[in-house]
């Protein structure tokens, strides 16, 4: 499965960067003054060592990762959500929508707004979300639920 995902995600002249390499890679790109677009796969749960930030998501107490927002602050990023629709079999319509927080008094306003947008997208077409990555594996105490 990893090889398949790597092959799919590395088409069209894209560069895949591991989580460990991300900050150095992005700072290098930013300092070079060249324009670039970065996509984070942000719908998955954080690992058990990063269960610090929680919100309600799909009526569940849910941990969320904030790395994309934290890194974005260092490179003066604009944040976008990739809205996906499937009008018919084999056809997908993808639209970039700017993430504009409604409440920027929270600690991670862009991440929380992104989660609201993702939740809306999932509610409209739940069959498009990959449910197999066990989003709710841990509780707030870091204990495995399942």
Residue ranges and their predicted role:
Residues 20-146:
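Non-catalytic C-terminal accessory region of glycerolipid acyltransferases
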Residues 1-21:
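Membrane-interfacial amphipathic helices and adjacent loop/beta segments
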